[in-house]
Every structure is written in structure tokens, then in C-alpha cells.
Amino acid sequence: MKVLSRGPVADAVPLLSILTACDCSVEELERIAAFLETQTLKRWRWIHCPGVDSDCLPVEGMAVLYLPRAPAALRATALEEAIWFLLSRPTLPWVELREDARRGDLFVSRRSLPEGRIGARLNGRRQPCSSAGLPNAPRKRLLLLAPWLEPGGADRCNLDMLRALAREGWMLTVVASLAAEHRWRDRFTALTADVWVLPDFLAAEKACAFLAYLVDSRQPDLMLLSNSAFAYDVLGYVRTRYPGLPVVDLNHMEEGWDDGGHPGRAARCTALLDRHWVVSGHLRHWLLDRGVEASKVEVLHWFADVDSWKPDSLTRAKVRARLGIAPQCVVIAYAGRLCAQKRPELFAASLGELARRGSDFVALVLGDGELAGELRNDLRRHGLAGRVRMLGWQDEAELRELFQASDIFFLPSAGEGIALVLYEAMACGMAIVAADVGGHAELVSAHCGFLVPRRDAEREARDYAARLESLMREPEMLRRMGQNSARRIREAFTLSLFERRLRGLLERVPVSTPCGVCTDSPVPALGAARLSMQWASYRLANGLRCRLDIQKHGRFSRFLERCAKGVFFLRTFGAKALWQKIRKH
């Protein structure tokens, strides 16, 4: 038997023991070693022996990994995930790791060791010691708690901030708490290997324990909460256990649920937070009106990368030729997730009114979502099928080219912080017609476009159509507003200015612990229960969609999700509570 000790402390009890067969070649052993060095787990012992029943194995609390060969495709967090998969399920003797880092279901439970495959076993139920994991490093580390890794404005903000911090030398740890497709996982793992999607490997009741393990092993210098209900649920636990850890939240817009959505939770939990970062002055005033101290709320306006997002006449001509759009035709762009917040029905009604006024235009819908089917029906009802092209989600390069080929950006949202897509649309030289909501007036000046106040839908449609028509009838004003938009971004909302503002915010985060009374601090068990319900209902709805071959985004798909949530709510809280919830809403 050959025993090799790895890690900073050779005589420490290893968190994981690696078992390899005695017939492994030297080349295979080298490949296994190379794989292990890529893992986020750094404390392990390697045992090169002929069998799995060695006298050295039955050690209380030891996790054992059978590794007959080097895996080809396991993500960098696989070993730590395997340990916590087992810790979450103490009665499970074995687990098999699938060799596909792209799959969410990385683990399959086994009752016996899979012959010739990768497997792990946990002897005893001791939790990993706090010193295990990544070694201490002189670089600063951020721990980000987010709900998911999905296309959208909040996740774009998270990515932008992580990139900026990575350029400053920060190390990054990202935790996503909800069950979802996590279509942007690759974008986050491109910045850091330390990305954790909790429902992929963890039992919900262990979520708090795992968060404590991450804090103990990673030793972050700052915890950032970004639109995460779970983060607010466990905030009291975090502040009690780690009083010296600075905690900041990042919020974008007030919402109509739970007395303001996440900003409402932030206001009620302000005693437990060191700082509140918001993306608009509008949201800052909203928080101040709810009793948050002015000194704790700081505005971080976003940006567009003007080296990439800029007017380009050659691209404009190329894209229009590809789409069969005449050079002089006015092109209206509408981009984002097709959901109730973006009001696609008002987009269709406004363009229908514009068409009835005799205006000639082409509109591009750049996005997808649960209301895509309804939007198609609305476009047909308004006679716009030939004028509006639904192009679906675009990658960044394609979206930029389509923006450069467009003249007007139209966004009739029900609510926003400051829509990120406005920064990029303006940088590409588009005039803006958008809803006067949130902090839009902080970005879109009267020289760059029109902001339309909220009214009843029919009147708003006429107002939007009138603004769009005025731009189309006055080409010189349209051109001038587009130029002003691009100039405003170059002068006040660039990446370098954003990074300078972010550095200033980080320098002002206090080291001292906040004190006071939190008016909304649920116990961690409630946060775990909410996670468990969301994970279970998502999996049930997803399974039904697959069995019934139902599209992910659509009316019936949303009905299935509501039914699944109702089933688990009924099972957890009973019929009376469900009826009260239905009556309330």
C-alpha cells in the first residue's frame, strides 16, 4: 500500500481519502493527480491499494472516493459537492458521480460500490472541519448569494460586478439557491470555478450548514446578497455566527409582492446589513422613505462597454441587408424577457396604433419568455405579423449588431430600476422611447428620447404611438437624439467610471458589526422549508413538462408550475392555509 498525503498540513485528518487500484499505470496516476489539482477541495489523502476494505478506511467521519481512472468531465467543485451530497443524506452508503460537468444531476445514489466507476462513501456523519477546503490566500474574496444563474438584468449585473472584481484581483465564490435551468452557469464558471448550485447536490435542510462551511473554508472578506430570498432568510443566522463578516445587499427595483419585494426585505433587515447598494437614485429614496439610514444606502449606476457597444455604419448596412430591411426604413428594437414586467401586450398595442396612423416601420423582438405565445397572438390581432419579427434570444455579439442596425429602442415596462438594456441601446446610438418608471429619468435625458408616464393601457398605447410617430416624421430629430444617447453613455456611464465607483463603495464598507433590531428575520428552518418547496415544485413541473412534451415557456407550462406549487403548499401547510393564500391573492 502506498499512502501519499496532500494539502498544507500533512498530518491532519483528511477530509477525503482517494482510493486507486494497484494496477493503475504511472500515466493514469499522473492523470488522476492532475484532475485532483483542478478541484476546489484541497485537503485529501491518496491511498494507492488493491481493495476497498483496507484497515485504514473505517475511520469515523472519513469520506472515501474510489477513483480507478481520471475523470474526463467533472466540474471543479465535484468532490466537495459529493461530500455534501452524502452529508445531506446520512442513510445513503454510496454515490456515483456522473462524468458530465454540464448536467445538473451530477450524482446518482447507489446501494453498493459501482464496479469500475467513480463512487464515494461516508463513514460516520461528522461534518467537514472548518479548516478544510481552500487554503487561506492574501487576495480578497467575495461570497455572492444569488437565486439563479439565468439570462436577465440582475444576473447581468452580477456578472459585470464579478468581472470587475476579478480584474481587481478578488477571488470569487458564487452560490445559487433556487432550482432553475441556470443557463448562464458557464458564464459564471468562466470567472471562477467556485460556483455552487445548491439543488444540484444538497438537501435543503443542510443549506445553512453548507453556507457556514463555505464561510469557514473560504474566509470571504465580503458577503453580497443579490435578489436572494434565501439570503435574507438566513441573514440573522449569518450575523450571529459571523459578526465580523461585512454583509451588503444589491437591489434593482421595488416590486408589488411582499411589501416591495427584495428591497422591502432589505428595509426590514437593515439592522443586519452594513450597506445597501442600489442601481438608481429612485430606489435609494424609496428605501429612505421606509426608514433606512441615508448613510447606509449608496447608488451604483451601471454602464455600457463603449469599446464594443457603439454606432457602426458598416454593421448597420450588413445586418439590414441580411434581414431584407431598406436602408431608410425606421427599425424599432424591443429586447428582454417576454414577461408581465416588460408588458409585451402594450408593445403590440402601441405598434398597432402606430401602424393605423400610416407609419412605415419594422420592429425586432429580441428575447423570449413565458408570454411569447401571447405576444404572437397579439401581433396577429393588430395586423403586425408582417412588420414585427420575433428573433428570440440573441448572444451578446448578435444583439449588439441588431442594436447597431436599429433606430429606436422601445421599452414600455411596468417597472424597472434602470433597465440595463437601455445603457447598451443608447451606446449604440438609438433614440429611446420608454416608460417613465424607476430611475429611467436618471439615464434618459430629454435630449436622448422620450419617457412616457404610466396611465391606463389604452391611453399609454396612444402616447407611445405618438412619441414613436414624432421621431419617424422628423428624421433629423431621430438622428440627433441617437447621437446624444451615445454621447451621454461615453461621458457618464462607461466601464472605467463604474469600476471607479465600485472601488469607492468597497472602501466605504465598514468593518464594524451593525446593531439594532431586525423587523423581518425568519429562522433558518423557514428558509430551508421555502427552498425545499421550490426545488420540489420545480422538479415536479419540469418532469410533467417532459412527460407531456410541453414547451418550457407558455401558458400551460405556467399553469403546471402553479399546480405543482399548490400541491406542495397543500402537503406542507394544509388546506386551510392554502385557501387563505388563494383568498389573499
For the regions a protein language model found, what residue spans apply to each?
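Non-catalytic membrane-proximal stalk/linker segments that position and tether the catalytic domains
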Residues: 1-14, 98-141, 148, 513-585
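Conserved donor-binding/catalytic core segment of Leloir-type glycosyltransferases
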Residues: 139-146, 326-342, 348-351
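Carbohydrate-associated surface elements
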Residues: 282, 303
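A short, well-ordered alpha-helix in the C-terminal region of glycosyltransferases
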Residues: 321, 470, 477-492, 504
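Short alpha-helical donor nucleotide-sugar binding micro-motif in glycosyltransferases
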Residues: 393-394, 401-406
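Aromatic "clamp/platform" in nucleotide-sugar-dependent glycosyltransferases that forms part
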Residues: 414
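Short hydrophobic beta-strand element within catalytic cores of glycosyltransferases
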Residues: 431-434, 444
